[in-house]
Design a protein with these regions (language model features):
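Basic nucleic-acid-binding interfaces
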Residues: 1-32, 38-80
Length: 80
């Protein structure tokens, strides 16, 4: 068995909590379509658009997709 650093786990977050973290890092909510909040951030000539489901608990795969699309560091969404 290998021993090494323990990888921090992602927190269980709601869609609103994820939007709050994203807003603290330059994203803004531009609209809502159904149960999805649409977050955007302008980076140079590019606009990054990330839909975030407004659910009480986001599934880990969904959260990982949001992290990947947003370009934010995973550490913002991990347990402390």
């Amino acid at each position: 068995m290998r021993r090494g650093r323990k990888v921090p786990r992602l927190r269980v977050l709601s869609g609103r909590q994820v939007c709050k973290i994203m807003a603290e890092h330059g994203f803004e909510q531009v609209r809502q379509k159904g149960s999805h909040l649409i977050m955007q951030k302008r980076i140079g000539n590019t606009t990054v658009t990330v839909p975030v489901p407004d659910h009480d608990e986001l599934r880990m795969g969904t959260l990982l997709g949001i992290i990947r699309q947003s370009g934010l560091p995973r550490s913002l969404f991990e347990t402390e």
